[in-house]
């Protein structure tokens, strides 16, 4: 019997994810020497090294790689048990993920409404791209995520639909907007790889990236580049009130049928928090409709 402790498994998981003792120790809220000691003790129990210590990084051994996948599954199961117990108590903690093209525009009102509805709720927000949120959700590191649907493999509740609008330099405001099929030839500025909004914009204008594409990490950067006359971009309706006033740009609706996306909340199909999450969905839905979202039909 190895007699592994849950604490050791969590420390191992942190080091496997960060590949750096300092960052892993910070994530675990312990000192680096304490983390090193726990990892050393874990390796002694296995009778072999799980990590290769290098000057500036950590590499995993073959056993370490094999163990990492299983430890992630174990910790997710433990978190499910913790959630099962929590489901029989008032909701006290929520680890909520959100994509960057939603967070700045929706979260302020969502957080206010959550605080009003659940005064004792401790909310931890994680903002990152869809792929990372899906990974962390599957591993049990977050409880739910607000994303653009669809995202396969999870329980999903559509919350609202919002249009994509064309943003172009203010000097072009009087010109008719280009047809969607002509955006492929325009100087369409895009978010960098990994953002679902990039994929959605490419889907609107065709399957291939447009010429002279510029990759940014935020909608704010895209809008500023448009204001400087470097191209055009698409932004979701909820972002207009914040972003369009920060640069000399014009915002135009496309002719029907307008391109759009559906925002929803996802969680694990086995999550014991399904009932309170459905209640929270209604809070997010109302906040979305307040910033221009349209309730899903049916």
Go through the PLM ranges and name each one.
Residues 13-34:
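Short helix-boundary/capping micro-motifs
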Residues 43-46, 67-88, 280, 284, ...:
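Alpha-helical linker/hinge and terminal dimerization helices associated
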Residues 91-152, 216-218:
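Central regulatory/effector-binding core of bacterial HTH transcription factors
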Residues 129-133, 138-142, 147-148, 190, ...:
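Hydrophobic hinge/microswitch elements
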